[in-house]
Regions:
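Short beta-strand/loop motif that positions the catalytic acidic residue
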Residues: 230-232, 236-238
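Hydrolase active-site cap/lid region
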Residues: 163-221
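The serine-hydrolase catalytic nucleophile loop
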Residues: 84-98, 110, 117
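Short beta-strand element of the alpha/beta-hydrolase
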Residues: 75-83
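N-terminal cap/lid segment of alpha/beta-hydrolase-fold proteins
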Residues: 27-73
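N-terminal accessory interaction module
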Residues: 1-37
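Gly/Ala-rich beta-loop-alpha elbow adjacent to hydrolase catalytic centers
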Residues: 153-157, 161
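Alpha/beta-hydrolase active-site loop
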Residues: 123-144, 150
Length: 238
């Protein structure tokens, strides 16, 4: 088996396209069964970029969680938070830039990740509870010598980071945040999904109402944009 990356279209003929192809690891042959993922790099920091790292565990109220720790020469640490259904591999695209800058980093897991403790509800809470795990990771970084933190959130990780900024007493240790396609209003995201599927608006509203009762979803609490003026740290948004 192997891991390869495909890029831009080089040639398109009818229903066929020839794309850039780069083998990053192992060996792949014509006819091999493959699957696609969006991360663009294999495995872990060492496999992806040759970056030495330690697989550490930090303690949260829900239990112990795994994280990749990469050392650096600076005392500002970067904490990276992946999105829903993703993994720490989502951060590999940015990790080499962080390492080149000399910044230590911590790429974390949180409740309901594979191998991690589950949320008491059994479901993702889109930042309502996961921010506690981010806070625990921040406490770990500060205990290890971080003077301040830059926090990166991908997709649902952006919601986790935002609620951390609203809820955590450690917000004054945050030098800045980076959002990569953050999901900051779950209700609006569901509405857009319905529009993209040409569903009548009232059907989406009914579905949200039913799911709110069925899964105890507080749609208003998941609108992190409603009090965005409370965020006082610098934000870089992609």
């Amino acid at each position: 088996g192997g891991y390869a990356r495909v890029g831009e279209n080089l040639e398109v003929t009818g229903n066929e396209a020839m794309r850039e192809y780069e083998l990053l690891e192992g060996d792949l042959s014509v006819g091999d069964m493959v699957r696609f993922e969006k991360y663009g790099y294999p495995g872990d920091p060492l496999r992806a970029h040759g970056i030495a790292f330690e697989d550490i565990r930090f303690a949260s109220p829900m239990g112990e969680f795994a994280a990749w720790q990469v050392d650096g020469t600076d005392d500002t640490w970067v904490v990276l938070v992946h999105g829903k259904g993703a993994s720490r591999g989502e951060a590999l695209r940015m990790l080499s830039v962080i390492e080149d800058a000399g910044l230590p980093s911590l790429t974390i897991t949180y409740r309901n990740d594979d191998g991690a403790p589950e949320d008491p509800s059994g479901y993702y809470q889109y930042g309502l509870t996961e921010w506690n795990d981010l806070e625990a990771a921040a406490q770990y970084a500060l205990a290890e010598g971080a003077s301040d933190l830059i926090i990166v959130g991908y997709s649902m990780g952006g919601g986790i980071v935002t609620n951390f900024l609203y809820q955590s007493a450690l917000v004054d240790r945050v030098a800045g945040v980076i959002f990569d396609s953050p999901m900051l209003d779950l209700g609006a995201t569901v509405d857009l999904g319905g529009q993209n599927r040409n569903l009548p608006g009232f059907l989406t509203t009914v579905a949200k109402t039913i799911s709110g009762f069925r899964f105890d979803i507080d749609w208003a609490a998941l609108d992190y944009l409603s009090n965005v003026e409370e965020i006082t740290v610098p934000v870089l948004l992609f």
